[in-house]
A protein has these predicted regions:
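Bacterial Sec-dependent N-terminal signal peptides
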Residues: 1-28, 281-282
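N-terminal low-complexity, Pro/Thr/Ser-rich intrinsically disordered segments
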Residues: 24-59
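N-proximal helix/coil linker or "cap" segments that precede and/or mark the start of modular domains
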Residues: 42-54, 80-81, 86-90, 94-139
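Thiol-/selenol-based redox modules, centered on thioredoxin-like
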Residues: 117-122, 239-282
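A short beta-strand-turn-helix
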Residues: 139-160
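Conserved redox-active cysteine motifs that mediate thiol-disulfide chemistry
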Residues: 156, 163-181, 185
Length: 282
């Protein structure tokens, strides 16, 4: 019997010694997700470096896996609140998962607060849009530039894509060609496209004679946009479901197109594209 026990130990011991502990498994998993796509040191070395990366690569209004500074999963709400504190920036993580992963990185206390201030402002705007998800689209009744009446009943049975804009908004106009192509792809599907403009009917008609925009255009919508929807940044893009519930809110055309396509969570700008001038940090 003693010899049998010795023989069993000879065969079983290697199996026991090779088995990973739960702690070791967690370390491996963390190693798979903690590699940032962009160098943290590079980003915080210069405000313009960070802003160019953040503007082109980070979409806080998209769906993403949120990781705290210890690489632990947290809710999107908690993630945005951490960013609002001004103590962190976020960097996309190199991951093989389909869902984009963002991780929090703490800013040095002695760093110039320019990055912190802009990060706080951007995260706050994203948080305000995030809170809109799941809420009912406000009641409205309006006539578009062609005399067709619209109300909440228009949402029934279809997904509605909405854009806010005004004529002198350069960013609003710059994305119209991209949105026209988007409409062409989905015009025969159960998706409709509405735009809420702050301008009056006549200026809009004059604008549309020279500039094609394939969304239905609703004039004089500043009250709906800024007082009911509480949106102050233009353009903003919303997806409303067939029950009139706001499903998603985005800041860029590329993000809403990507969401509808369900191909990627965010269409990233070409590396040759330049970010717009950094916003004031104050």
């Amino acid at each position: 019997m003693k010899n049998l026990i010795i023989i069993l130990l000879v065969f079983v011991a290697p199996l026991i010694s090779c088995k990973e502990s739960p702690e070791e498994k967690n370390v491996v998993k963390k190693e798979e997700v903690i590699r940032p796509i962009k160098s943290y040191d590079y980003l915080i070395s210069d405000y313009k470096n960070w802003w160019s990366y953040h503007y082109n690569e980070i979409a806080l209004t998209s769906d993403f896996e949120a990781l705290n500074e210890d690489s632990e999963k947290i809710s999107k709400e908690d993630f945005l609140k951490k960013l609002i504190s001004g103590d962190y920036i976020t960097i996309e993580i190199d991951s093989e998962k389909d869902l984009t992963a963002y991780k929090l990185y703490r800013l040095p206390k002695d760093l110039d607060n320019e990055i912190s201030n802009v990060m706080k402002n951007d995260a706050y705007r994203a948080f305000e849009l995030f809170k809109m998800e799941g809420t009912k689209f406000p009641d409205f009744k309006v006539t578009d530039v062609n005399g067709i009446e619209y109300s909440n009943k228009k949402f029934e049975g279809k997904t509605t894509v909405i854009k806010t804009w005004f004529i002198n908004c350069k960013a609003c106009i710059a994305e119209m060609q991209e949105l026209n192509e988007f409409v062409d792809i989905y015009k025969n599907k159960d998706i409709q496209f509405l735009s809420l403009a702050t301008n009056e009917r006549e200026p809009l008609l004059n604008f549309l004679k020279k500039n094609e925009f394939k969304y239905d255009v609703l004039p004089n919508q500043e009250h709906l946009i800024e007082n009911k929807l509480k949106l102050t940044v233009y353009p903003t893009h919303l997806i409303v479901n067939e029950k009139g519930i706001i499903k998603k809110v985005f800041k860029k055309a590329s993000q809403i197109i990507s969401y509808i396509d369900q191909d990627k969570l965010m269409i990233k700008d070409e590396k040759t594209n330049l970010a717009p001038p950094p916003p004031p940090a104050g």
